Amino acid sequence: MRALLIVDVQNDFCEGGSLAVEGGATTAAAISEYLTVEGATYAHVVASRDYHIDPGSHFSARPDFSRSWPRHCVAGSSGAEFHPDFDTSAVDALFSKGAHEAAYSAFEGTDDTGAPLGAWLRDHGVDELDVVGIATDYCVRASALDAAKLGFVTRVLLGLTVGVDPRTTREALDEMRAAGVELAGRPLLEDHDEDVVTQPE
């Protein structure tokens, strides 16, 4: 059974947010359109969100944008909410991550019963996973790598992701490909880089 994992399509990761990725809003809308057309082909649709309460050194007034970041996706804030262009009506389960520490992979998240994503997927008979969301080179990358490591047949639909930077996106694509993740399409980047080449759609 195949499921769709939608990673961190939140206000703070889209234009106007505290850790915005250019193209985030476009990606949110594209995912909603994809769900309208293809959502019924998935046994389950799940989503993750950053949901920070007190993540310690993950937040910094002087972030290095590698290990520390500006405040973002604080639990209960508007920045932690899903972007309004992302229609969540098809989402079966929501997994929150990063409450008290840094968390990039959706597989570090749990649902409102405390069930981790990997266990939830297995319990629901899922063995294949498509991954989309924000950002290609950070949380999408981490989620796809964990999915493959856990034995899920994993595919990233790059046309429904957006990368922060061409260099780190290229590195993420290479790493995912080396881990056996199937890459379909091309990620959205603010400055399109023709060197970011993946399998054609």
Model-identified regions with their sequence ranges:
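Histidine-anchored nucleotide/phosphate-binding helix
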Residues: Y34-L35, Y138-K149
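Acidic/histidine-rich helix-loop elements
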Residues: C14-G23
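Charged helix-capping and loop-helix junction motifs
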Residues: G24, T110-A115, R170-L173
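Structural recognition of alpha->loop->beta junctions
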Residues: R71, G79-A93, R167-E201
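Short, glycine/acidic-enriched loop or turn micro-motifs at the edges of active sites
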Residues: N11, I53, V162
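Active-site alpha/beta core segments
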Residues: A29-E128
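Extreme N-terminal starter segment of soluble prokaryotic enzymes
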Residues: M1-L4
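A short glycine-rich beta-strand->turn/loop micro-motif centered on a GG-aromatic cluster
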Residues: D130-G133, V153-P166
